Amino acid sequence: MRPILLAGHERSLNQIKFNRDGDLLFSVAKDKIVCAWWSANGERLGTYSGHLGAIWTVDVSPNTVLLATGSADNSVRLWNVKTGECVKVWEFPTAVKRVEFSPDGSKVLAVTEKRMGFLGTIAVLDINYDGDFTNQAEEPSLRITCTESKATVAGWSYLGKYIIAGHEDGSVSQYDAKTGEQLENVQAHEFDHQINDLQFSPDRTHFLTASKDKSAKLMSSRNLAILKTYVADTPLNSAAITPKKEYVILGGGQAAMDVTTTSARQGKFEARFYHKVFEDEIGRVKGHFGPLNTIHVHPAGTAYASGGEDGYVRVHHFDKPYFDFMYEVEREQLRR
């Protein structure tokens, strides 16, 4: 599995995303620009510039027409994917740490930071696809305020029915996406170990969280039941579910300030593959010189990409052995 190395950023990566078709990959870092790449060969298509601070988060609409980004300049920007122009800017009182389009692309949620007397919020913005896309609503259609512990990540469940959020204190909440009412709150991870990532399965019925407490949890979107736990030996920054095969990929590594030796092995900067059902670690992929900050899997399950503290994005297209590998139990099932 030879990786394609994408060097388009000068600073560490914050988030990467494939589009729904999987032919494009978008990456954002602390250097104020968004890069768009062909995922097949790693060729850079172009950049989207306009933000005035580090960009924390990116997401692309299901039809690959619009791109949303959230930044430390306290704004969410909406971009025309094709032309690269910024069609709308929404200003917030604090930095925006996570954006995500709803499954039908009609809304975008934005998670804002708790700072300077402002509480952390989850704002929902309605998206209009008419004309040149500039005619967008000024105000959020819904605002959820996190009074207890601020949300660090959030996403939409199946059919956009619930908004699921991961918090700084290690808990996961479920909100009604129409009213904003909190329906459920579960202490999924160790108290005060924040949740760094939350990614859904393709059908959005379950999701995976990655936390500073060195574990990832597979949870149900309907009732927040913890279905599986994957234990690692390093704080986790990102976790993704692979379609096609029953695996999960976890990424992390010691924070830069905690690393005492520079050996890549020492810092545990590998992508780890676990079996989704049996919770066993089945392999690792080395490469990054520094912690992995973000992982995203190709929607067809044929590749995955990781972005690191080292400023590189690595795209791995899976080889045949990856698809052939099976547990004895799985082989038995096939024979029946």
Curated annotation (Swiss-Prot):
- Organism source for this protein? Emericella nidulans (strain FGSC A4 / ATCC 38163 / CBS 112.46 / NRRL 194 / M139)
Start and end residues of the WD repeats are 8-47, 50-91, 146-185, 190-229, 287-326
Function per UniProt: Component of the eukaryotic translation initiation factor 3 (eIF-3) complex, which is involved in protein synthesis of a specialized repertoire of mRNAs and, together with other initiation factors, stimulates binding of mRNA and methionyl-tRNAi to the 40S ribosome. The eIF-3 complex specifically targets and initiates translation of a subset of mRNAs involved in cell proliferation.
User: Does the record's keyword annotation contain Lyase?
Assistant: no
One GO MF term, please? Answer: translation initiation factor activity
Q: Name one GO cellular component term.
A: eukaryotic 48S preinitiation complex
Any single GO BP term: cytoplasmic translational initiation
Against PROSITE patterns, the record matches this protein to: WD_REPEATS_1 (PS00678), WD_REPEATS_2 (PS50082), WD_REPEATS_REGION (PS50294)
SMART domains per UniProt: WD40
Repeat as a keyword of this entry, yes or no, is yes
Protein's name according to its UniProt entry: Eukaryotic translation initiation factor 3 subunit I
Keywords from UniProt, A to Z, are:
Cytoplasm, Initiation factor, Protein biosynthesis, Repeat, WD repeat
Compartment(s) where it occurs, according to its Swiss-Prot or TrEMBL record? Cytoplasm
The principal location of this protein is: cytoplasm
Origin, by domain of life? Answer: Eukaryota
The annotated subunit structure for this chain is: Component of the eukaryotic translation initiation factor 3 (eIF-3) complex.
Q: Name the Gene3D superfamilies on file.
A: YVTN repeat-like/Quinoprotein amine dehydrogenase
Query: What Pfam family does this protein match (any one)?
Result: EIF3I
Which protein family is named in the record? Belongs to the eIF-3 subunit I family.
